Amino acid sequence: MKPVQELEKNEVYAVEFQGVSTYYFGEAKPAITNVWLKIPPKSLTLIVGPNGSGKTTLLETLLGLLKPKFGRVKLLGYDVPEQVNVARRMCGYLPQDFMRPPGEPFSVKEIVGMGLASNKPFGKLNENDWLMVEEALNLVGIDDLANRPVGRLSGGQQQKVMLARALVRKPKLLLLDEPFSALDETSRRFIAETLLPSLIEDGCTVVMVSHDVSFKPKGCTMTVRMNSGRIVEVNLR
């Protein structure tokens, strides 16, 4: 597949799928089939397709949550799943299933702080860590919710909290699975037209999954269309 841009010397693709097929346990039919895809750094890629087309499976395979049966996956230059733990520390991920139960005891800032806790036990974040949490809350526009119990928030507010958690470590790669599903129009437009383009300018790579084929964030450099577990079309810009 033709890349969006030529890589500079010593650069690596943010995402590489080389003939990848992934199966769910006990299933005879692959969830994704013979996927070939390269995503350059500092770009915004939109992956679209109907429900069940393999979009979420693609992200789960990339993060090593599912192991491919065939092919090779590289995440930020690291082999998946062998070196995925190293690569994950440089990634932010907003899953499709983000809702917290009403009885969830943690506050918004504690939930966001968990995004920094991969290398240290939760509760031992230092002053600089909490400043990073505050910055992420401000970035998404939910600093006023910092001390609220997350379980008492609306679905849209919780989705913003989980987006802030994905951003708190200033990731090199941000993976978003249906990030607008619970948001109102104003929030959608802010993220799509202001937040995501600013992340790209700062050197982040964004990969966003959506079933809404009519929606395209500002600055999108590549649209990948999936159907029945296969990539059926790739459009540049």
Indicate where each model-derived feature is located:
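Catalytic Walker B motif of ABC-type/P-loop ATPase nucleotide-binding domains
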Residues: 174-177
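Conserved ABC transporter NBD signature motif
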Residues: 71-79, 86-87
